[in-house]
Amino acid sequence: MTQTLDAPGAVIAYDLREPAEPATTTPLMLIGSPMDASGFVTLAGHFTDRRVITYDPRGTGRSTRTDSEPESSPEQHADDVRRVIEASGGGPVDLFASSGGAVNALALVAAHPALVHTLVAHEPPTVRLLPDAGTAEDAVRGIRALYDRFGTGPAMVKFIEIVSFQGPIPPGFADEPGADPATFGLPSTDDGSRDDALLGQNLLTCCLFEPDFEALKYAATRIVVGVGAESTDELAHRAGRAVAAHLGVEPTVFPSNHSGFLGGEYGQHGDPIPFAAKLREILD
């Protein structure tokens, strides 16, 4: 069942999947950013014994922006998630959050810990926590500059390169020539738009966000930080380990990679069956 709610500057669409039998367990919410609800179809299918909540972040999918702001912040996304949880019957929920969604979930728990029983934050790309924070931040800013100058194709090429790069990000990363965008099926010409949900709206605010670790440490929420078994040394994996270290917990290794829960969404195949089993093990 799909519903919508009004939030400052946006209309947020969200979905409720009800279990076949009355649920006795905590509702499960699945979020990404800028990944919308369509990325969680496979994973949701492994939790038919729970009420499952998904949503489209503002400016993605069915969630339309009603303001003229060029960017969205993790705090804004966190407030949107709060509204969805409260509109869906209130918390607490168990929350699985992937990538940028994990960044937003950390902001949510810092502000509203009572809404989340267990947070599983899978590979949040918080580059300012890395040992190579300076060059990593320069690279992220460089990708945004490419987008502003040349549009989606060249910037997305460098984004793909940075998220798959293993090890510390070298100086001048974004200045090195990238592959032909057509190699990745990306446009080689600039259509003039600058409202891409990833490159325009969320790249800087997400990657440069610094969680409130004091608030997170004192939160009653159980926080589990996940990293992929096959994404070792990639930026988001390393950032996930950095978040875990700041929280004083050991990261939990999930099967597959950064997108391990995908079962064909966006043409990507992770290893969703063992991934879902690992998530269930944590939540149960």
What role is predicted for each listed range?
Residues 247-284:
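Catalytic active-site module of serine/aspartate enzymes centered on a nucleophile-bearing elbow/loop
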Residues 6-65, 70:
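Conserved HGGG/HGGXW glycine-rich cap/lid loop of the alpha/beta-hydrolase fold
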Residues 30, 95, 225-227:
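Structural beta-sheet core signal
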Residues 135-142, 146-250:
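Alpha/beta-hydrolase
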Residues 91-130:
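Conserved hydrolase catalytic core segment
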